[in-house]
């Protein structure tokens, strides 16, 4: 059966060449007579996988030795607790930018462990724009300022960043490796792997080493960045298979030219979709053009009564998971690194045919 195109927000499409390589190695990894899922995380073989994955990740993002790279359990949701537990005081203060659903989730969790100040918010306009950095009101007493560069549900992003008087913390779950970023502007970047890195269940943290060492006393050992760093991300048994696949994805990305190369593809994919939507009277996108995400493209049908028909017929055409989040409705095409450009082309062909078929309904 030919593979279909997955436009879901995550777990996302994996590069097919990576899946085939994993399939080939699944029963016998490097002649051991065992699957990589069966070998000890303490074995020399897995230590090699882990070290190579970190090395390739560092190469792709030009991460200096001033930063620790951690691979963790729990994805980004657990990081919503880990960040304040490790960087803020229980009676201290942290600043957060409220840009949408995931920013609000981060804020709600952080409020359990420190005092939160909202530095900026676009909730007054239903999150149709991203608060520009120049509008952020930062309290100098804050331990850090946190923002979510790409909001998957709303389909908006902030793609440029200047330096800040406060340490900058960013949830890069859905934007990591999609385009070049200047790591040196950040103090901590975290995210879940299931968009652009690999299977779900794995998280990543890139944190300045100078910030390690002062967690809140209540911080569980498994959520303590310092202990995770000292234990080389193996304080307990890590999600070994997801880590192994992540290493394969890093190798794949390097083989096609790295982050700059995939960014050109991503810009092209997104431009095709937005150009088509903007030139249509049948579809629309509500996000301020300068804040549009290159990873998640939400769109509405002029006739909402056709939503279910669109989903049924697109699924029959091999275009899966296009339903928008329940909080915003409509449709959403998530076009992460692993989704080939021909997937976007197939979606555009379907959207055009659907419009021609139902424009008079």
Which residues make up each language-model segment?
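PLP-dependent enzyme catalytic core of the Aspartate aminotransferase-like
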Residues: 1-4, 316, 329-361
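N-terminal "arm"/small-domain region of PLP-dependent enzymes with the aminotransferase-like
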Residues: 1-40
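Conserved N-terminal alpha-helix of the aminotransferase class I/II PLP-enzyme fold
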Residues: 31-79, 86, 101, 109
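Conserved PLP-anchoring active-site segment centered on the Schiff-base-forming lysine
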Residues: 88-104
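Active-site phosphate-binding strand-loop segment of PLP-dependent enzymes
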Residues: 110, 121-176
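Conserved active-site segment immediately N-terminal to the catalytic lysine
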Residues: 169, 183-194, 203
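Active-site C-terminal subdomain of aminotransferase-like
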Residues: 193-274, 288, 358-361
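Conserved PLP-binding catalytic core of the aspartate aminotransferase-like
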Residues: 283-314
